[in-house]
Amino acid sequence: MDLISVLPSASKSCVCLHKPLSSSTHKLKPFCKTIRILVMPRRWEFARPSMSLSTVASEDDIQRRTGGYLSNLWNDDVIQFLSTPYGELAYRERAERLIDEVRDIFSSMSLEDGEFSDLIQRLWMVDNVERLGIDRHFKNEIKSALDYVYSYWSEKGIGCGTKSIITNLNSTALGFRTLRLHGYPVSADVLKHFRNQIGQFVSCPSETEEDIRIMVNLYRASLIAFPVAFPGEKVMEEAESFSEKYLKETLQKIPDCSLSREIGDVLEHGWHTNLPRLEARNYIDVFGQDTKNMEPNRKTEKLLELAKLEFNIFQSIQKTELESLLRWWNDSGSPQITFTRHRHVEYYTLASCIAFEPQHSGFRLGFAKACHILTVLDDMYDLFGTVDELKLFTAAIKRWDPSATDCLPQYMKGIYMMVYNTVNEMSAEAQKAQGRDTLNYARQAWEDCLDSHMQEAKWIATGFLPTFEEYLENGKVSSAHRVSALQPMLTMDIPFPPHILKEVDFPSNLNDLACAMLRLRGDTRCYQADRARGEETSCISCYMKDNPGATEEDALNHLNVMISGVIKELNWELLKPNSSVPISSKKINFDITRAFHYGYKYRDGYSVSSVETKSLVMRTLLEPVPL
């Protein structure tokens, strides 16, 4: 359905001129080849979903399209009635004592572990503190342990200990994964030494728990793959195929237990949708439950207690931040914007799942606010606004002056001020963290994003279908990945001087790939619903136009191949050895990609938020872990 390009009479004569910025509008380059529990209301009361598509007449008598999206699931009462005891000092003091005790465990490894198990013991500790979500407390200990392991690394891998006579697939797979994730230069060729003549990585006729865990670690290692064009990386695909098949068959044979649940989690979330806090929540439930996972009890018990306490203590921080987010949401006039999706709680949850260090409150709140605003703008440009109104709004944003609202229809005035005030506030937060003014830099990113939305609105209004390449180049900008990441990222205690920022943000390949990932994955999940709302333009339709005779299935297969390639390119950009940019500086942008990918794993989780996304909120935000 075409948008109706009719302006209210009061707006027709208004001309908005914008103040130019010093930097020029960019175009993205193409991407490369018991306890007390959380006290809640007696009953959860979720707003009832509505999925009907409709056309409504606004106050100015213009027929406007609305998306019929699911309404907001999280009303004020759900948040305001949250209560948790874990903000009390006693819990924090206990956590601090446990942190010291775990440090002692790291320190004692050099004394207690024999030379036939010293390597696997160090890898076991590093892997488990990371999977349990408590690694931020042990950065020095982790580096020391991995330096030790790497000093014994060979082209054939490692054994369980420094005195082991032969190398071991379990130690090598776990070591390869952990070392690569921390930036050590390790080649995938090492896995070739564990294949037999028919391509099997290990023969497991008994299918013991130990054998199964070897395959779990091989599968986890295989997902940290670089593009196959790199030497040795072909074996990663073979390892993934072999171990995935083995684990899926194993799930059909073994009883329901913590090991089967661990396998299920690993297979379901892999690497690119395995958000760190969600992984921690899932792993807490299975850690230490199987006897083969029970290293000396002191280690397991201390790690598990600390992980549970840390998880619950952070929920007390989340409660305070959610209250702040709700105040912003109400004060910004968001409840009165009825044509859009309201997913501020879901976006906050995603931010909390990738940056749950207490000091990163600015990132979590900034990400939730930016994504909420971008969702409002997306629905306004795609559905509710007319082309002429949207031209006025785009020009008004470029003026960056509250008086620019004089040009706008009434419903746009509040949206404009929400953008204006929030971007300015985030810029002030970024200036505190980075020590320099980044407002003009951020404004340029927002302007580019709205220009790309404007282009899509024109395509929708005229029914024009661009080429696949033209659509994708514009779509990488309109995906809004850059805008959602930029300002929240700059509020963190990670330094982003200009020479580092350009390697993480535009014009870096990391940024280009992240934008491409969001556009490609989003279109594969949204194109049918978008088409039902009158939005014909998508990667799928443009590919089919460029390739006469191609079916939707052909287009989806092509996009999925592209997505697989982008994932490996992203891995390389994050982890390539000898990079001038620390992994910590790139990791947050990379993790934002993982968060968006999670939302689109099975469906458009931002429009249909009552399934996986709702479960994520419940599991990581609202439900505490029993101690």
Curated annotation (Swiss-Prot):
CDD domains: Terpene_cyclase_plant_C1. One of its GO terms (molecular function) is terpene synthase activity. It comes from Pinus taeda (Loblolly pine). Its cofactor is Mg(2+); Mn(2+). This is (-)-alpha-terpineol synthase, chloroplastic. It comes from the Eukaryota. It is found in: Plastid, Chloroplast. The Asp-Asp-Xaa-Xaa-Asp/Glu (DDXXD/E) motif is important for the catalytic activity, presumably through binding to Mg(2+). Keywords: Chloroplast, Lyase, Magnesium, Manganese, Metal-binding, Plastid, Transit peptide. Belongs to the terpene synthase family. Tpsd subfamily.
